[in-house]
A protein has these predicted regions:
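A shared catalytic/ligand-binding motif for oxyanion handling
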Residues: 1-176
Length: 176
């Protein structure tokens, strides 16, 4: 399985190297696909589950997709969700070596300062994850949670010692 924040799947899929790279995987999860309900992005040998962002805006944003190889896709089922931040897929145990179905949650949580971030939506996501984990034996969460670090910063701070040691110019120092 591979997971990637693509920041626009349609645009990325135009590059043959991008598509060819994923041939070695059975499942590919993409977040920030920026797809709408009517968009179709084909990857040869795969079929797609897609969940566009429910909240629309002027330009496309968000969105989640899972591509499964054709022979696995028939064993996959899209599960309903109340959250815009996660897409749930169940993979039947008959196609794995597990004794129960595998539940995959593909997530994209917008940055906390984004206009699309919503505390209630985050709470819904947390509740759904808790519910899935309590009702299923195998739950796998993947995606982009945008560094939810509690009270810690979610960005890199400038190290003054390194700035002096490498004699960084003012423009670089002020970037951080």
């Amino acid at each position: 399985m591979a997971t990637l924040n693509v920041c626009g799947l349609k645009r990325r899929s135009q590059y043959p190297d991008f598509i060819e790279y994923f041939d070695k995987y059975d499942l590919i999860c993409f977040v920030e696909t920026k797809l709408e309900d009517t968009d179709v992005v084909s990857i040869p040998g795969f079929q797609c589950f897609s969940q566009p962002r429910k909240q629309k805006y002027i330009r496309k944003s968000g969105g989640i997709a899972l591509y499964a190889k054709n022979d696995i896709f028939e064993h996959c089922k899209h599960l309903s969700t109340d959250s815009d931040y996660i897409m749930w897929i169940s993979i039947d145990k008959s196609s794995t070596s597990m004794d129960e179905n595998l539940i995959i949650g593909v997530t994209y949580v917008p940055p906390s300062q984004s206009r699309f971030f919503n505390d209630e939506e985050l709470q819904t996501l947390e509740n759904e994850i808790t519910s899935m984990c309590s009702s299923h034996k195998y739950v796998y969460i993947t995606g982009d949670l945008n560094a939810r670090t509690a009270n810690l910063i979610d960005y890199v701070q400038l190290d003054e010692f390194l700035a002096e040691e490498f004699e960084l110019d003012d423009e670089t120092v002020h970037f951080f």
